[in-house]
Regions:
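Glycine-biased, small-residue-rich flexible motifs in mid-sequence functional cores and linkers
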Residues: 67-200
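Short, positively charged patches
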Residues: 1-123
Length: 200
């Protein structure tokens, strides 16, 4: 495949994803380093069918697709060289607010750790009421950060290691649904993607 970095270079060189696909046969003349394997990857009928299936899922489930060019795309993430070209989102939140706190921690949180997490999130809600909490949806500190944010009525977003056609772990589904009104679920992965270790 082309990957995030390769796709970003193509779009930077040509102008947009639409232009890259529209002018794919001309790419070797327009951009140094583009070879036939890239054109083959861009010309893959199976990839087009997969993209159509994904868009049907997006529309049916009222998801938001954020591309690197979208103003709503998380600006801090956009600065990373390997930022995903497309993000899929379900929920309601501004990713580009002034205060964003990413919280991660052990999956085997102690009672002290859980209480510290809850107290920290509560203090944030008092000091920075517009704060956005971002974490995974895993056991331990991840899920406790989201639950603390919900309890203190502050925005919280879970970054998922799989597509939006599933929730993993399933026991966190209620919390995930509760987050949709003031935060939501974000992923770079297509549907039918399982939460493999390399995705975390």
């Amino acid at each position: 495949g082309i990957g995030h970095i390769g796709a970003k270079r193509l779009m930077d060189g040509i102008g947009s994803a639409v232009d890259v696909f529209g002018r794919r046969k001309e790419l070797p003349e327009l951009l140094p380093g583009v070879n036939s394997s890239i054109i083959t990857a861009l010309d893959c009928p199976a990839a087009f069918l997969r993209a159509e299936r994904e868009m049907e899922f997006v529309e049916k489930n009222r998801l938001t697709c954020l591309t690197l060019q979208d103003e709503a795309y998380p600006s801090r993430l956009r600065e990373c060289e390997d930022a995903p070209i497309v993000l899929f989102f379900k929920g309601n939140v501004d990713f580009n607010r002034l205060h964003v706190i990413n919280m991660v921690g052990t999956r085997r949180a102690t009672e002290y750790g859980k209480q510290f997490c809850a107290d920290f999130v509560h203090d944030l809600s008092v000091l920075l009421p517009d704060v956005l909490i971002v974490s995974g949806l895993a056991y331990g500190i991840d899920i406790h950060a989201h639950r603390a944010a919900l309890a203190d009525n502050i925005s919280t977003v879970a970054v998922l290691a799989h597509g939006l056609d599933r929730i993993y772990p399933f026991v966190h589904r209620k919390t995930a649904v509760d987050m949709l009104a003031n935060g939501g679920l974000l992923t770079e992965f297509l549907t039918e993607t399982n939460p493999g270790k390399h995705n975390f």
